[in-house]
Amino acid sequence: MRYTSADFGNTKSEFDLEVPKKLIHRELEHTAIAEDFSAQRKHAVFVADLPSRTLSLTIGHLEPGQTTSRHRHSYETIIYVLEGEGYTLVEDQRVEWAAGDAVYIPVWAWHQHSNTSKTNLCRYVACENAPLMQNLGAAVREEFG
């Protein structure tokens, strides 16, 4: 059912709890590489296969000296750097980061991530509200060029 502003008074007073069967994705970095998405992004991306309808979680790997494709999307992203150092280019602003830092990517901002190390892997967790935007029919992603 789709609601409009006229349906505001029809909000339920009770909630029906629905606990999904799948509540855990074990060994994410060993079981869930998203081959097509990784190829498009030009770096390894591991996607948590969980039933969230509003949030996604991925782990990204950037090899030494590697840079992702430049892209933008209609959903927000927060990245937490697990290990490594580098920078994220957000529009024309260079944001330097290292392990322990969190980086915010705003909606529809061109961005790309770079590992500045010549020897060490970079690993990061990305949390996005992409499933929410997909369910609302408002998710858009564009690669640069």
Each language-model region and where it sits:
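A short, N-terminal "cap"/entry segment at the start of jelly-roll beta-barrel domains
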Residues: 1-54, 140-145
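Conserved short histidine dyad/triad with adjacent acidic residue
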Residues: 40-43, 58-72
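Short, charged/polar surface micro-motifs in flexible loops or helix N-caps
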Residues: 52-54, 63-65, 85
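Short, conserved secondary-structure segments in the cores of folded domains
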Residues: 58, 74-77, 93, 101
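Short beta-strand His + acidic residue motifs that chelate non-heme Fe in jelly-roll/DSBH
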Residues: 68-70, 88-89, 105, 111-118
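Glycine- and acidic-residue-biased ligand/ion/polar-headgroup-sensing regions
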Residues: 75-86
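A short hydrophobic beta-strand segment most commonly corresponding to one strand
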Residues: 78-80, 104, 119-138
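Short acidic-glycine-tyrosine-enriched beta hairpin
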Residues: 92-108
